[in-house]
């Protein structure tokens, strides 16, 4: 293939996807990712009974699909947020240390590539999960548990998602508020996990942002210089850049499974019931810039298909938001290539274009270092050494 006058970059990652969150998308996702130049994905949580078949299908010999790395279910606490009753089934409970050890053994046996700790775990269970993951050689991802301070979590995990709950440690007296949250998390009334988490977010998120303490926040970020932050700005800051206001949104919907496209098309003007207040979106953009200035590594992930995150397409929106937040185009590209490889200890095999590296490549018609939006100008993809031209990529989607 003649690439004269075009631009070659390493294959892109979406570092935060959910293959099983909405099963209308599961079968279509591999083609949608490749169609947009995403050659590797990290599935950050779902039940094994749903995720394993999807992973096995993607990994089967001859499959035209991205590389996939998966975590299995979210490792939550006594009260599970994504419990399958009040929220989609993504998590499992770890009410005590013995259960946590048993769950880690089961996930390791199932062949997970990493594990993800969720928001309702206790400090005691968190410590056990960290110990087990380290003993088993499994990288750790997660949200900052509501029972803990971000500065006590970051040094023990390799990545954190959504900037979640970091604002609660960026105040003058975070120890007092974490003690308050622990009292609420005792949950004597047995409130469902998802409801309990939402109550705590409402009670502490915006007040913490309003009480921002720069000295305290710098201390928090100093603890995270070896922890990849995956801010999912296209989700956190959805109100600042709704995808359905873009001129190409109709083309995006046309590639999606018909039932999901119809639903998104009907609800997009209302933000799907999401808030249009920009306090948290603005904070998210501010915090990513502060992290960038503080030397905290940033990874690019979307949370697709949550929050109008069209698989594949949304990764380019995330790169644009990272640049808007203060990263250079090169740094944004590293967030979708080098950083994910580093998480898995694969920086000697993936993430850059060098002899001997895995053959995952994307050919663009424009230079993304001049304009990050040009990562959308995909002309061809090499996935696992196989070349797919534009016609072949378009044939992967409806």
Model-derived features with residue positions:
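Active-site mouth loops of central-metabolism enzymes
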Residues: 13-24, 83-99
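Metal-cofactor-binding active-site regions of metalloenzymes
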Residues: 64-89
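Acidic, glycine-enriched loop/beta-strand segments at the rims
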Residues: 310, 328-333, 342-378
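Divalent metal-dependent hydrolysis catalytic cores, especially in the metallo-beta-lactamase
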Residues: 29-51, 65-73, 109-121, 130, ...
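Metal-dependent catalytic neighborhoods of phosphoester/phosphodiester hydrolases
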Residues: 26-27, 50-59, 302
């Amino acid at each position: 293939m003649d690439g004269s006058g075009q631009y070659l970059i390493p294959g892109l990652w979406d570092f935060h996807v959910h293959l099983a969150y909405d099963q209308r998308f599961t079968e279509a996702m591999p083609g949608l990712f490749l169609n947009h130049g995403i050659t590797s994905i990290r599935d950050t949580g779902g039940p094994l009974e749903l995720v394993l078949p999807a992973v096995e299908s993607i990994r089967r010999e001859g499959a035209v699909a991205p590389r996939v790395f998966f975590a299995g279910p979210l490792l939550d606490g006594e009260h599970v947020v994504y419990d399958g009753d009040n929220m989609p089934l993504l998590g499992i409970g770890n009410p005590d240390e013995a259960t946590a050890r048993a769950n880690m053994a089961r996930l390791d046996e199932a062949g997970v590539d990493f594990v993800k700790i969720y928001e309702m775990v206790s400090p005691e269970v968190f410590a056990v999960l960290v110990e087990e993951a380290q003993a088993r050689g499994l990288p750790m991802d997660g949200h900052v548990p509501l029972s803990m301070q971000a500065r006590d979590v970051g040094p023990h995990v390799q990545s954190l998602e959504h900037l979640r709950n970091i604002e609660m440690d960026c105040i003058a007296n975070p120890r007092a508020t974490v003690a308050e949250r622990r009292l609420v998390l005792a949950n004597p009334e047995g409130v469902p996990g998802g409801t309990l988490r939402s109550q705590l977010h409402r009670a502490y998120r915006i007040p913490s942002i309003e009480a921002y303490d720069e000295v305290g926040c710098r201390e928090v970020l100093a603890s995270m210089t070896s922890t990849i932050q995956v801010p999912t700005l296209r989700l956190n800051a959805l109100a600042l850049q709704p995808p359905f206001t873009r001129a190409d949104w109709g083309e995006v919907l046309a590639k999606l499974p018909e039932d999901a496209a119809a639903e998104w098309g009907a609800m997009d003007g209302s933000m799907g019931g999401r808030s249009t207040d920009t306090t948290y979106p603005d904070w998210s953009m501010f915090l990513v810039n502060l992290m960038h200035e503080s030397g905290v590594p940033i990874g690019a992930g979307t949370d697709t298909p949550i929050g109008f995150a069209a698989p594949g397409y949304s990764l380019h929106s995330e790169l644009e938001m990272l640049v808007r937040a203060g990263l250079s185009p090169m740094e944004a590209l590293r967030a979708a290539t080098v950083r994910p490889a580093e998480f898995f200890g694969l920086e000697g095999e993936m993430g850059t274009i060098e002899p001997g590296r895995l053959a995952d490549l994307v050919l663009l018609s424009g230079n993304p270092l001049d304009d990050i939006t040009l990562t959308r100008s995909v002309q061809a993809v090499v996935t696992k050494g196989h070349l797919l031209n534009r016609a072949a990529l378009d044939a992967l989607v409806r």
